[in-house]
Amino acid sequence: LSIRRQRQMCIRDSKYNNHNLKKTIMNAPILKKMTKEEIEGSYKDAICNMLNRNKIGGRIIEKWFNRDKHTGAFDMNLVKERGFYDANILDVQQALHSARGLAQIEDAGEELISHSYVLVNDIRYVDATLKRNLQGLGVLLGMMGSAFVPIAGSALARTIGETGVAINDLVVGFKVYVTSYLFKLDWNEDVANDFYSNLWYDNANIEMSRKQLFDNQMGNYKLTYVGCATVYSGETSLAGVKNESDMFLKVCTRSIDKAISELQKSFDEFKVFSPLISTSPLCAHIGLKEGVGEDSRFEVLEKVLDSEGRTKYERVGIVKPMKGKIWDNRFMASFEKEEGFDLEYTTFEKISGRDFFPGMLIREIK
């Protein structure tokens, strides 16, 4: 089973909308020994260039506005679905004729489209013993697109067996470094106004000249670098692991989740808003996977509209997780049965603030 295939299976985080494009895997160049800072610096520029060269920003716009592959027309269905907006509010043709309507369209863009991110995960194998044995067979683990986990019964596995390396030893020794590079779609008021005024059309108003214009300008939608986080998988419990594929998924999924958690702590704009699902008890569907610990603190936010109909978030209080009530929602946690694995949410207690209501949002603070 190829690492490429397994890699595709372990990147989806339910706390973020799945906005995946068709292109999700790329080959990483083999670099000579570098420091962590040198690797991150070299890769971020190469990745950013690759993303922009492949017009990933334009493809994100196509995805958001559900572009028709035949007519090139757009619609707001996905924006309505993701943002729970009323259909009449997001009628672009009507909105262009009123300042308030345009403000609400821009608000939808600010709420959703401008918070479009691309996460590129560089996974590198680090176990010296296994790497040395496999390199002797001409296999280099750790570079995406060229690495495979040997399956029992395969020619590679049999060869490894002949060298005296047991399959179980391979599984136990599987450790990785994951560096997650975060990029953000450059979507601002000027870009949005140009799109809606000069490029937008729907299937009721086909304009082939605009289709050609958007096709020509897809490369103008850029992604900018936000930052990166590097984590080490360390030792991983074998609970629930039946084969090499399971181990790869468990190690890499947990490492990527940990890297995402580190990015959230470092960059406020990337932090997830989680709704309170109840106030008795006070709880939300986040846990260890998101890096929640006893020392974590969260602000409680209420969504309000200003006089122009734009969304704002006002802090109404601060809460903290209750000891022994933190949900262990890590990948395959049910097999390890550590504290919190049998919970369905994390329970919080109020530090300050007024009354809270279900649906209010919480966001981690430093």
What are these regions (language model features)?
Residues 246-270:
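Short, structured interface segments
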Residues 191-247, 268-272, 276-285, 300-366:
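Beta-strand/loop-dominated core regions that host nucleotide or nucleotide-derived cofactor-binding catalytic loops
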Residues 116, 122-235:
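Amphipathic beta-strand/beta-sheet edge segments enriched in Tyr/Trp
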Residues 292-294:
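Short, well-ordered loop/turn sites that connect or cap secondary structure elements
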Residues 1-11:
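Single conserved hydrophobic/aromatic residue that forms the stacking wall/gate
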Residues 8, 112-114, 173-178, 279, ...:
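Extracytoplasmic
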Residues 27-165:
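Short, solvent-exposed, polar/charged sequence segments at loop or secondary-structure edges
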